[in-house]
């Protein structure tokens, strides 16, 4: 039962952090590319890799921080919806392809780097 509560608490914190980062990025950047999603997904991948590489998977730490906070922070569903939005009438195939590839490649590199440091 404690594990479920830790995941819930962490997930709430991660979701609020994502909302704050999204709001800040929308105010700071006037970009056609959704920068906030890139920031949260790549940073989350780096931290998850670090935790995997350093065996920081204590009984309470992993459910709270990785599953909860980082699960609430990172977002595959928002990435998917942003990609669908890029398929609008002003569709730019190169923007769609580059954004898609960069999300997955940089996320993997960040996770790998986090694991190795």
UniProtKB/Swiss-Prot annotation:
- Residues engaged in binding Na(+): 71, 74
Q: Which GO terms describe its cellular component?
A: plasma membrane
Q: Which residues cross the membrane?
A: 1-21, 33-53, 61-81, 94-114
Q: Give the matching InterPro entries.
A: FluC (IPR003691)
Q: How does it sit in the membrane?
A: Multi-pass membrane protein
Q: What does this protein do?
A: Fluoride-specific ion channel. Important for reducing fluoride concentration in the cell, thus reducing its toxicity.
Supply the alphabetized keyword list. Answer: Cell membrane, Ion channel, Ion transport, Membrane, Metal-binding, Sodium, Transmembrane, Transmembrane helix, Transport
Q: Give the activity regulation note.
A: Na(+) is not transported, but it plays an essential structural role and its presence is essential for fluoride channel function.
Q: What is its main location?
A: membrane
Encoding gene (name): fluC2
Q: Which reaction does it catalyse?
A: fluoride(in) = fluoride(out)
- State the organism of origin: Staphylococcus epidermidis (strain ATCC 35984 / DSM 28319 / BCRC 17069 / CCUG 31568 / BM 3577 / RP62A)
- What molecular function terms (GO) are annotated for this protein? fluoride channel activity; metal ion binding
Q: Describe the family membership recorded for this protein in Swiss-Prot or TrEMBL.
A: Belongs to the fluoride channel Fluc/FEX (TC 1.A.43) family.
Record protein name field: Fluoride-specific ion channel FluC 2
Q: Which GO terms describe its biological process?
A: cellular detoxification of fluoride
The subcellular localization recorded is: Cell membrane
